[in-house]
Amino acid sequence: MTMPYYASAEQIMRDRSELARKGIARGRSVVVLTYRDGVLFVAENPSRALHKVSELYDRLGFAAVGKYNEFENLRRAGIVHADMRGYSYDRRDVTGRSLANAYAQTLGTIFTEQPKPYEVEICVAEIGRFGSSTPAQLYRITYDGSIADEQEFVVMGGTTEPIVTAMRESYQRDLDLESAVRLAVGALQKGGPAPAGTTEAEPRTLDVSALEVAVLDSNRPRRAFKRIAGSALEEMLPTPAATEDAPANGDAPS
């Protein structure tokens, strides 16, 4: 008599975790960090149509890595959740924590109850109301519904270790926008494989066409989300000589 296949609950959870982690690691990296005037999103993303970074609500932003169709479903659901809560109660009742908790509950349920987990990792960013001194807040939500709040930066997707190391070495809380962009791009360039025809010792170069950049700007009175592209972004990118040492001082010359 053939015995039925059996796997322990622990083994099933380990297999699901491994599947999700591998799917996330195959994607390109995203860096989210706080800077002097709000929150900066920098994603390695050559697509102009399929965004990894998005607005959720007035003072809330969203970034994700992994399978696009899965995190796009989450993004849309988050926007609907925020709109319904703001319409039913008050716009001030729509907070990053409430959205992060909703995402965590959804991902946790999918991870434990569905045959396949979502291969995604997301970040919900929030800045204070216009004119307030409330610090920005970052919430990281992983594939299994785990949630963590961060005060400085979040790195997701791809090869994160060298990117995290570069960020820890040079990050400062009071960076201006240009310095923050250069720091994030310089860190991203340390993450991925070397381009074809180059040695591993040669750093990668990410230009405007390979980046998706946006901010939550606390100086904007209502809708704080703004994309940065084209010549405005090109002026902020680090020069090849500067990529080896990202600026450690927000006021350092380029």
Swiss-Prot record:
SUPFAM superfamilies: N-terminal nucleophile aminohydrolases (Ntn hydrolases) (SSF56235). InterPro entries: Ntn_hydrolases_N, Proteasome_alpha-type, Proteasome_asu_bac, Proteasome_sua/b. Gene3D superfamilies: Glutamine Phosphoribosylpyrophosphate, subunit 1, domain 1 (3.60.20.10). Residues 234-254 are annotated as: Disordered. GO terms for cellular component: cytoplasm; proteasome core complex, alpha-subunit complex. Its main location: cytoplasm. GO terms for biological process: modification-dependent protein catabolic process; proteasomal protein catabolic process. Pathway: Protein degradation; proteasomal Pup-dependent pathway. It is found in: Cytoplasm. Belongs to the peptidase T1A family. Component of the proteasome core, a large protease complex with broad specificity involved in protein degradation. The 20S proteasome core is composed of 14 alpha and 14 beta subunits that assemble into four stacked heptameric rings, resulting in a barrel-shaped structure. The two inner rings, each composed of seven catalytic beta subunits, are sandwiched by two outer rings, each composed of seven alpha subunits. The catalytic chamber with the active sites is on the inside of the barrel. Has a gated structure, the ends of the cylinder being occluded by the N-termini of the alpha-subunits. Is capped by the proteasome-associated ATPase, ARC. This is Proteasome subunit alpha. It comes from Rhodococcus erythropolis (strain PR4 / NBRC 100887).
